[in-house]
Amino acid sequence: MGARDCTPLLMLSFLLFPLGFPVLGAPARLICDSRVLERYILEAREAENATMGCAEGCSFNENITVPDTKVNFYAWKRMEVQQQAQEVWQGLALLSEAILRGQALLANASQPCEALRLHVDKAVSGLRSLTSLLRALGAQKEAISLPDATPSAAPLRAFTVDALSKLFRIYSNFLRGKLTLYTGEACRRGDR
């Protein structure tokens, strides 16, 4: 009864054991699945659309610095991978700071709208997840490996916004632009 009962269980465990191996490399490949990035882009667009017509409660009492999301495709394609990684990593860091600052300003507002707070909280969560996924893809290491003395490593271009709708537009544009370009190239390289 004892040995016979263990045999099917042992066989089942041998069958299921290899299924655990793909999970070890899942985070790096996860960002390479276009549906994952599309989900974050969709959330950013929803937040942008929700705040477009918003006047009351959507303006900040101070300016928030955000990354410039414009992409010169010719220059981008000629950039070294490390430069692209640095631009994306710095942009993501600045955008995270901006969203967190927006969250703090919204929390201190006299009558914060719960729907706006929900969109900001989702953006904070999304940026944390994207940061983790980019770290698994190696973006942080590539950005750090770029020598500071490289003349083509220009400082990140930035400007300020004064409203939640503008902040979400930048968030959406950054995800659709530089982040999508970088992850697409990093995933195509196939060494991840």
Curated annotation (Swiss-Prot):
Keyword Signal set for record: yes
One GO cellular component, as annotated: extracellular space
Subcellular location: Secreted
Main localization category: secreted
PROSITE patterns: EPO_TPO
Keywords, comma-separated and alphabetical: Disulfide bond, Erythrocyte maturation, Glycoprotein, Hormone, Secreted, Signal
InterPro entries per record: 4_helix_cytokine-like_core, EPO/TPO_CS, EPO_TPO, Erythroptn
Protein function: Hormone involved in the regulation of erythrocyte proliferation and differentiation and the maintenance of a physiological level of circulating erythrocyte mass. Binds to EPOR leading to EPOR dimerization and JAK2 activation thereby activating specific downstream effectors, including STAT1 and STAT3.
Protein name (Swiss-Prot/TrEMBL): Erythropoietin
Species in which this protein is naturally found: Bos mutus grunniens
Gene: EPO
